[in-house]
Structures are given as structure tokens and as C-alpha cells.
Design a protein with these regions (language model features):
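ABC transporter nucleotide-binding domains
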Residues: 1-129
């Protein structure tokens, strides 16, 4: 079995709180697990209701915020332990595309239209399928 491209193990992110802050804590993500294989040119979509942790997950995967507990591994390397040079290389390979709610939920667009835009713009396919 090959090593996964991205592996998220028991990821938890808690905002707020702190020893002396007196602020309440907010659990934005709790014990989240995801494995993305090493297939070339694949697109993975995370969808969910508002406030379900999608943006927090993206920020954790991209290394923009620190994980409270758990691990995020890219090609077997812990994202939290990467130095600046490794982070720059990592961010060249992993990107988040945030949704445009007006385009995604436009009743005049079919799902195929939305995916075709991504596939064509990033040249992910050689032919129409």
C-alpha cells in the first residue's frame, strides 16, 4: 500500500479559552479523520452547513492555524513541524479553493458546469468525459 498524500488523524481545533483569558472555548473541529490517497489529478470537496468546521479544516490543512490536538501529515510529514522552506513547498502543492455561494448555489448552473470550470481552468483532463 502506498503512503497517503494527505492524512488527517484525530484533528481537533479549539478556539478561545486560555489559562487567564476567562473567555469561553469553542470547539471548531473535533476528532476529524480523513485520508486522501496519492492518485494524480484528483479533486476532494469538503461540503457542510455553515459553522460545521470547513474553513477551520482548510486553515489547519494549510498550516494557517495551529492544531489543538491530532496530526496532519502530507506525504508522511507532519505539517505542524515543517520549517519555513518546507511550508513554502507544501503550499505550492496544496491549495484551498473557497466556495462562491452565488456560483455554487446558482439554480441555473448544473453540478457538471461547476466541476467543468475547475477541470478546464486547471487542465486536469485531456478530453471531455
Amino acid at each position: 500500500m502506498t503512503q497517503p498524500l494527505l492524512e488527517i488523524k484525530n484533528a481537533t481545533k479549539i478556539y478561545g479559552g486560555g489559562f487567564l483569558s476567562g473567555q469561553p472555548t469553542t470547539v471548531a473541529l473535533q476528532d476529524f479523520n480523513l485520508t486522501i490517497g496519492d492518485r494524480p489529478a484528483s479533486i476532494t470537496t469538503i461540503a457542510g452547513e455553515s459553522g460545521s468546521g470547513k474553513t477551520t479544516l482548510a486553515n489547519l490543512v494549510l498550516g494557517f492555524v495551529k492544531i489543538t490536538s491530532g496530526q496532519i501529515l502530507f506525504k508522511g510529514n507532519d505539517v505542524a513541524l515543517m520549517d519555513k522552506a518546507q511550508q513554502m513547498e507544501y503550499r505550492r502543492e496544496v491549495q484551498a479553493i473557497f466556495q462562491d455561494p452565488y456560483a455554487v448555489y446558482n439554480p441555473f448552473y448544473r453540478v457538471k458546469h461547476i466541476f467543468d470550470l475547475v477541470v478546464n481552468n486547471f487542465k486536469l483532463a485531456n478530453n471531455k468525459s
